[in-house]
Amino acid sequence: MTTPDKQTFRDAMACVGAAVNIITTDGPAGRAGFTASAVCSVTDSPPTLLVCLNRGASVWPTFSENRTLCVNTLSAGQEPLSNLFGGKTPMEDRFAAARWQTGETGCPRLEEALASFDCRISQVVSVGTHDILFCDIVSIIRHPAPQGLVWFDRGYHALMRPAC
């Protein structure tokens, strides 16, 4: 059996839908943010999630030094904000495009996020090109947006809440 090549892996991963998130930080190393879909729950006791971050990303040193982050899960209609944080736009312009509050850790929390998870990075594991950031959740804020946003098949898709 042969190991799948990089393109085959990427094409298969495009079939795996995931929530769209903006990951933010602020602290001694400065303020930064990026768009990520590589985010998932680890355990609820204690509440912990993980975020994958490429060590070659321009924001990596900032997150690495600050050791705090906020996972802001986007709702439908926030695609332009996702694109802004996913590109090469200067940080100041990224943050100017939305309304933010400050979370308990000092990280920016998106006011209109579907959910915001304010976290402290408790452990970092390096695998290949990425660091897996294990994050202890300090606080959670939810917003009653009617639709979620997922990335699937290399595009955005809205998810409706089920009717009760």
UniProtKB/Swiss-Prot annotation:
GO terms for biological process: nitrogen utilization; uracil catabolic process. Its EC number is 1.5.1.42. It catalyses: FMNH2 + NAD(+) = FMN + NADH + 2 H(+). InterPro entries: Flavin_Rdtase-like_dom, NADH-dep_flavin_reductase, RutF, Split_barrel_FMN-bd. Gene3D superfamilies: Electron Transport, Fmn-binding Protein, Chain A (2.30.110.10). SMART domains: Flavin_Reduct. Keywords: Flavoprotein, FMN, NAD, Oxidoreductase. Pfam families: Flavin_Reduct. Belongs to the non-flavoprotein flavin reductase family. RutF subfamily. Coiled coil: none annotated. The lineage of its organism: Bacteria, Pseudomonadati, Pseudomonadota, Gammaproteobacteria, Enterobacterales. The gene is rutF. This is FMN reductase (NADH) RutF.
